[in-house]
């Protein structure tokens, strides 16, 4: 039986990473943003929300970027089925040699799989440069009911920000439109090999609303508006609407002196509806 394949004998993360990298014959790639989780306590920050999902009956998952399997193999002890999508084919091949039968390791692009996945649960210690794209892909995929994501701490702050806060952004609008987001934990750089230059945060997402095609236009307007987040919202939105070929709605002037960073996600949806006609 391969190491880590039983539900009772969990491998230490550092030992597992060492073995998988040895089997793959590779060193971490800066180009691919590879940082491997080697701290068992940090692995637990990801496992706790996965165990909660499993207890609620969500037992099939997609993992984006399993790397050396630090989260994959422990997660297989609580989930019935995992499809793990790894971009690096050497890592995918090495991990597949150690993974239990309930884990299917495939080579591919994680963002594309996130958008098309049939699994109700997605988890990922995300490559930092892909975090926003992964979140957007998950938002659009209404089959995804929940997600557990490791992201750069600053991105986590934006994902969980509320209107009026310093970190509020287009990403905040996107997440809030369809998910309930919570900061579940923080992972220090020392938990990774090699060490990243930033803190990692574990964010949980729970779907609270289905994605609507209307939201794409709402996010387009939000993206335009947040390029001038400290300006008066009515003036900025008027320019954004005109650039999109839409007539500003009569209620736009009622925003008064409100700034862009004070607008609610629902305000952008209302603008998108007005733009639609």
From Swiss-Prot:
One of its GO terms (cellular component) is cytoplasm. InterPro entries: KsgA/Erm, rRNA_Ade_methylase_Trfase_N, rRNA_adenine_dimethylase, SAM-dependent_MTases_sf. S-adenosyl-L-methionine binds at residues 35, 37, 65, 86, 109, 125. Keywords: Cytoplasm, Methyltransferase, RNA-binding, rRNA processing, S-adenosyl-L-methionine, Transferase. GO terms for molecular function: RNA binding; rRNA (adenine-N6,N6-)-dimethyltransferase activity. It comes from Aeropyrum pernix (strain ATCC 700893 / DSM 11879 / JCM 9820 / NBRC 100138 / K1). Belongs to the class I-like SAM-binding methyltransferase superfamily. rRNA adenine N(6)-methyltransferase family. RsmA subfamily. The keyword Cytoplasm applies. Its EC number is 2.1.1.-. It is an enzyme of class 2 (transferase). It comes from the Archaea. Specifically dimethylates two adjacent adenosines in the loop of a conserved hairpin near the 3'-end of 16S rRNA in the 30S particle. May play a critical role in biogenesis of 30S subunits. This is Probable ribosomal RNA small subunit methyltransferase A. Pfam families: RrnaAD. It is found in: Cytoplasm.
């Amino acid at each position: 039986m391969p190491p880590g394949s039983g539900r009772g004998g969990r491998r230490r993360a550092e030992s597992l990473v060492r073995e998988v990298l040895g089997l793959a014959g590779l060193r971490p790639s800066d180009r691919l943003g590879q940082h491997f989780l080697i701290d068992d306590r940090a692995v637990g920050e990801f496992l706790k929300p996965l165990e909660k999902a499993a207890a609620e009956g969500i037992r099939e998952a997609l993992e984006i970027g399993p790397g050396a399997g630090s989260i994959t193999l422990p997660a297989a002890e609580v989930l019935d089925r995992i499809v793990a999508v790894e971009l690096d084919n050497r890592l995918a091949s090495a991990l597949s040699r150690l993974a239990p039968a309930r884990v299917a390791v495939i080579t591919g692009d994680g963002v594309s799989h996130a958008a098309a996945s049939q699994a109700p649960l997605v988890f990922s210690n995300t490559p930092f440069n892909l975090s926003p794209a992964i979140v957007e892909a998950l938002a659009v995929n209404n089959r995804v009911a929940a997600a557990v994501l490791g992201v750069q701490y600053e991105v986590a702050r934006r994902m969980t920000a509320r209107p009026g806060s310093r970190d509020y952004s287009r990403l905040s609008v996107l997440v809030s439109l369809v998910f309930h987001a919570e900061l579940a934990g923080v992972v220090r750089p020392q938990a990774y090999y090699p060490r990243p230059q930033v803190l990692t945060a574990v964010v949980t997402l729970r779907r609270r609303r289905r994605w609507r095609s209307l939201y794409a236009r709402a996010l387009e307007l939000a993206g335009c508006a947040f390029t001038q987040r400290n300006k008066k919202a009515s003036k900025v939105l008027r320019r954004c609407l005109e650039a999109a070929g839409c007539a500003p709605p009569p209620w736009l002037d009622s925003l008064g002196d409100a700034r862009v960073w004070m607008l609610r996600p629902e305000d952008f949806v209302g603008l998108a509806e007005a733009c639609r006609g």
